[in-house]
């Protein structure tokens, strides 16, 4: 097996080559993402209105569409060096197994205890909370990677951490729950009886397996009902995509180091944190006309926000207590089926990603979970990494694109984000291996109630 042009299996940046600034793609966007709206006044949210919910510096980052780069504080840079720079891996073995002329690379973000990219933003948000003198933070988590990452970050800065975990994942992934507790976090299955909004959701949807929207509502209520606490979010918000830009910046630097030009960039899409972070420098070049890339967002067919959602203002949470965001959404009342990609079970999408999609700078596809797990197992057997179900959505489409190259003979360069590992997802792998996994694709009538509940905004 040759490594033409002496491209190694793993491309690592040196520590002194790591980015020292986050890139704010909003500053380069011709059409800025629509502002968050106050659900009461329907006017853009102000700094003062967001202050009770988020840390002050994070509010500033959230509202800033113009600053191109933000300096990464030295303390955060030092923490990053525990697990960054992360490798850009040439998937030589996958290429050989597929018999494709395509060149496949993946950015591996699973080389830390959280098992995912989520630590990139968790440590930033915990840093700003500590700097503000807060007691602790609250949050939601789907599959548990974000909750794990935040518990690690809070432990590092000696902050209290309260996590509301989507009930289906709380039950399916007890080991990830215990990792959070090991780092000092308290973990509550959502929806729960511990909050007013949780009790209301349980009354309206008895036996529900929960959703990220439900967990967000509970975490926000828990933060705003006690002093010294703020809410932090693992995805969706512009501030999170800002912190996650380190993924794309490192990826671009690693490619440039070997004069590699990507043709296709692929990321899984739930709320948009990994996707937005990975694609940011690539889409920035595309906006400025400096390069052209096919950028593909991959979402589950059971929760198809981009491919079947509506571009409208909607609540970010099921309890309708958060600001309104303009995004591709299935409606805040939409509760997805209990699929095995808990991190992608969100009714909406980042406003930044939504605007990029609406402007046709990126495209989107949805895939069924049985096909996703087929790709996951194929990848695991040849590349030696057990991928998370979320990441495996990107693997599925990367394989599909590589097989298209096999048909056409094109030597395209495909880059995808391997967001994390699947070692705590063995219930899902077991269902697949036993032939018990099923696909659920909502019908139009299934989606209609969510759309009917969208806020009426002139």
PLM region spans:
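Positively charged, low-complexity intrinsically disordered leader regions
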Residues: 3-134
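Active-site/ligand-binding loops adjacent to catalytic centers
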Residues: 69-71, 201-239, 247, 259, ...
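Active-site nucleophile and cofactor-binding loops and adjacent substrate-binding regions
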Residues: 108-119, 137-146, 237-240, 266-271, ...
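A short, small-residue-rich loop immediately preceding and capping a beta-strand
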Residues: 121, 129-168, 261-275, 295, ...
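Alpha-helix C-terminal capping segments
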Residues: 124-134, 148-160, 181-182, 279-289, ...
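Active-site-proximal loop->helix
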Residues: 138, 146-209, 305-317, 426-434
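Claisen-condensing/thiolase-fold acyl-transfer catalytic domains that form or cleave C-C bonds
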Residues: 269-277, 369-435
């Amino acid at each position: 097996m040759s490594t033409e042009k002496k491209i190694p299996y793993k491309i690592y940046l040196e520590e002194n080559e790591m980015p020292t600034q986050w890139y704010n793609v909003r500053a380069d966007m011709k059409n800025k993402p629509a502002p968050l709206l106050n659900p009461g006044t329907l006017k853009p949210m102000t700094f003062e209105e967001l202050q009770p919910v988020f840390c002050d510096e994070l509010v500033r980052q959230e509202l800033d569409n113009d600053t191109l780069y933000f300096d990464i504080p030295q303390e955060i840079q030092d923490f990053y060096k525990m697990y960054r720079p992360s490798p850009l891996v040439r998937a030589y073995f996958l290429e050989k197994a597929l018999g494709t002329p395509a060149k496949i690379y993946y950015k591996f973000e699973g080389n830390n205890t959280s098992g995912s990219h989520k630590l990139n933003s968790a440590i930033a948000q915990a840093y700003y909370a500590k700097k503000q003198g807060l007691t602790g933070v609250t949050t939601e988590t789907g599959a548990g990677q974000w909750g794990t990452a935040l518990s690690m970050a809070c432990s590092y800065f000696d902050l209290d951490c309260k996590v509301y975990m989507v009930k289906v994942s709380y039950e399916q992934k007890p080991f990830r729950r215990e990792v959070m507790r090991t780092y000092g976090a308290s973990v509550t299955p959502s929806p729960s009886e511990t909050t007013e909004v949780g009790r209301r959701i349980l009354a309206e949807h008895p036996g529900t397996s929960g959703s990220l929207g439900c967990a967000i509502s509970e975490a926000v209520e828990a933060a705003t009902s006690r002093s010294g606490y703020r809410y932090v979010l693992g995805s969706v918000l512009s501030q999170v995509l800002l912190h996650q830009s380190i993924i794309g910046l490192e990826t671009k630097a690693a490619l440039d180091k070997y004069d590699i030009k990507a043709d296709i960039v692929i990321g899984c899409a739930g709320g948009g944190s990994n996707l937005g972070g990975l694609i940011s420098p690539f889409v920035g070049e595309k906006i400025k006309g400096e390069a052209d890339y096919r950028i593909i967002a991959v979402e589950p067919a059971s929760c198809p926000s981009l491919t079947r959602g509506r571009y409208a203002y909607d609540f970010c949470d099921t309890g309708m207590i958060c600001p309104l965001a303009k995004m591709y959404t299935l409606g805040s009342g939409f509760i997805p089926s209990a699929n095995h990609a808990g991190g992608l079970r969100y009714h909406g999408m980042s406003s930044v990603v939504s605007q990029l999609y609406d402007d046709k700078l990126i495209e989107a596809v949805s895939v069924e979970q049985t096909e996703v797990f087929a790709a996951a197992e194929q990848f695991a057997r040849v590349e030696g990494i057990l991928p998370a179900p979320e990441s495996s959505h990107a693997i599925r489409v990367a394989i599909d694109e590589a097989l298209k190259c096999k048909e056409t003979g094109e030597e395209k360069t495909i880059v995808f984000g391997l967001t994390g590992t699947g070692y705590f997802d063995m219930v899902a792998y077991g269902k697949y291996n036993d032939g018990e996994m099923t696909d659920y694709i909502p019908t139009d009538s299934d989606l209609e109630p969510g759309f009917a509940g969208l806020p009426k905004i002139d």
